[in-house]
């Protein structure tokens, strides 16, 4: 089952989250159509921006759109002109106030969607598919990925019959639910037809569900002190000022001096025996 299913949907609530977060009763159909139209609008004409994913969150009178991109300067434009244009088109499409957030992808070499888009662009530029796949795998592994698999399907190198080829490096455990696997898909448009590019990137294992990890992080942030131990208040008293500890004099009598101790030692010592004449 793990080999065929979409890894993002297979791990919802464990290592991934929904890309659209809202609730609707009677307007469910129209909201789904709006989400598809929003993503299609953002992908059209934004191929050079390197958009990894688009997250949509709705309230009663507002729509929040988060764009994760590798090149935020292209999406923002000069003095924010491009961002204003996108916001205006989204408000016209949805009929509500739109809050547009543009977020930068810190490490695009280990983002599956961006890797798939990069391979597809090379295939469109008549680069050998094996060379493009191996170069992408080497770059991802050097950037910190623990495993990667890239698959290309279509008329590879202009062959008469379409076929599927893939390359893999490292571990890609698709059946393991706690494995953090990123998945991306992109289509390359060539003179021989379209070639589909799929990418799986294994980033390591996660402990517990997504909600449990957030609760643990909040608990760690709320505990004072270092290392989860509460800090001790006040100063530690010195050795000579420890409260009302009784001294030897209070317990009865003064402490024996060195002279008295020496006299007692002499009295206790046995006298040497005298030699007796036979």
Curated annotation (Swiss-Prot):
<dbReference type="GO" id="GO:0022627">
    <property type="term" value="C:cytosolic small ribosomal subunit"/>
</dbReference>
<dbReference type="InterPro" id="IPR004044">
    <property type="entry name" value="KH_dom_type_2"/>
</dbReference>
<dbReference type="GO" id="GO:0003729">
    <property type="term" value="F:mRNA binding"/>
</dbReference>
<dbReference type="InterPro" id="IPR009019">
    <property type="entry name" value="KH_sf_prok-type"/>
</dbReference>
<feature type="compositionally biased region" description="Basic and acidic residues">
    <location>
        <begin position="232"/>
        <end position="253"/>
    </location>
</feature>
<dbReference type="GO" id="GO:0003735">
    <property type="term" value="F:structural constituent of ribosome"/>
</dbReference>
<comment type="function">
    <text>Binds the lower part of the 30S subunit head. Binds mRNA in the 70S ribosome, positioning it for translation.</text>
</comment>
<dbReference type="InterPro" id="IPR015946">
    <property type="entry name" value="KH_dom-like_a/b"/>
</dbReference>
<feature type="domain" description="KH type-2">
    <location>
        <begin position="38"/>
        <end position="106"/>
    </location>
</feature>
<dbReference type="Pfam" id="PF00189">
    <property type="entry name" value="Ribosomal_S3_C"/>
</dbReference>
<protein>
    <recommendedName>
        <fullName>Small ribosomal subunit protein uS3</fullName>
    </recommendedName>
</protein>
<keyword id="KW-0694">RNA-binding</keyword>
<keyword id="KW-0699">rRNA-binding</keyword>
<dbReference type="InterPro" id="IPR005704">
    <property type="entry name" value="Ribosomal_uS3_bac-typ"/>
</dbReference>
<feature type="compositionally biased region" description="Low complexity">
    <location>
        <begin position="259"/>
        <end position="278"/>
    </location>
</feature>
<comment type="similarity">
    <text>Belongs to the universal ribosomal protein uS3 family.</text>
</comment>
<feature type="region of interest" description="Disordered">
    <location>
        <begin position="213"/>
        <end position="278"/>
    </location>
</feature>
<keyword id="KW-0689">Ribosomal protein</keyword>
<dbReference type="InterPro" id="IPR018280">
    <property type="entry name" value="Ribosomal_uS3_CS"/>
</dbReference>
<dbReference type="InterPro" id="IPR004087">
    <property type="entry name" value="KH_dom"/>
</dbReference>
<keyword id="KW-0687">Ribonucleoprotein</keyword>
<dbReference type="GO" id="GO:0006412">
    <property type="term" value="P:translation"/>
</dbReference>
<dbReference type="InterPro" id="IPR001351">
    <property type="entry name" value="Ribosomal_uS3_C"/>
</dbReference>
<comment type="subunit">
    <text>Part of the 30S ribosomal subunit. Forms a tight complex with proteins S10 and S14.</text>
</comment>
<dbReference type="InterPro" id="IPR036419">
    <property type="entry name" value="Ribosomal_S3_C_sf"/>
</dbReference>
<dbReference type="GO" id="GO:0019843">
    <property type="term" value="F:rRNA binding"/>
</dbReference>
<dbReference type="Pfam" id="PF07650">
    <property type="entry name" value="KH_2"/>
</dbReference>
<feature type="compositionally biased region" description="Low complexity">
    <location>
        <begin position="214"/>
        <end position="223"/>
    </location>
</feature>
């Amino acid at each position: 089952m793990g080999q065929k299913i979409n890894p993002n949907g297979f791990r919802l609530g464990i290592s991934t989250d929904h890309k659209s977060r809202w609730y609707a009763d009677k307007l469910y159909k129209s909201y789904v159509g709006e989400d598809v139209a929003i993503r299609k609008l953002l992908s059209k004409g934004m191929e050079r921006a390197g958009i990894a994913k688009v997250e949509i969150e709705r309230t009663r009178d507002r729509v929040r759109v988060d764009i994760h991109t590798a090149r935020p300067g292209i999406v923002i434009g000069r003095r924010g002109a491009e961002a204003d244009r996108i916001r205006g088109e989204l408000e016209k499409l949805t009929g509500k106030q739109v809050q547009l957030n543009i977020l930068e992808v810190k490490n695009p070499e280990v983002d599956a969607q961006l890797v798939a888009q990069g391979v597809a662009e090379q295939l469109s530029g008549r680069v050998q598919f094996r060379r493009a796949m191996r170069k992408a795998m080497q770059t991802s592994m050097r950037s910190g990925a623990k495993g990667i698999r890239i698959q290309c399907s279509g008329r590879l190198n202009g062959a008469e019959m379409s076929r599927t080829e893939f390359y893999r490096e490292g571990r890609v455990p698709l059946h393991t639910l706690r494995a953090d696997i990123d998945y991306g898909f992109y289509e390359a448009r060539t003179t021989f037809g379209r070639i589909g590019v799929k990418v799986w990137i294994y980033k390591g294992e996660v402990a517990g569900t997504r909600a449990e990890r957030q609760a643990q992080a909040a608990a760690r942030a709320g505990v004072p002190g270092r290392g989860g131990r509460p800090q001790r208040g006040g100063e530690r008293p010195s050795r000579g000022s420890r409260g009302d500890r009784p001294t030897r004099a209070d317990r009865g009598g003064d402490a024996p001096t060195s002279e008295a101790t020496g006299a007692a030692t002499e009295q206790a010592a046995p006298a040497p025996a005298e030699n007796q004449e036979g």
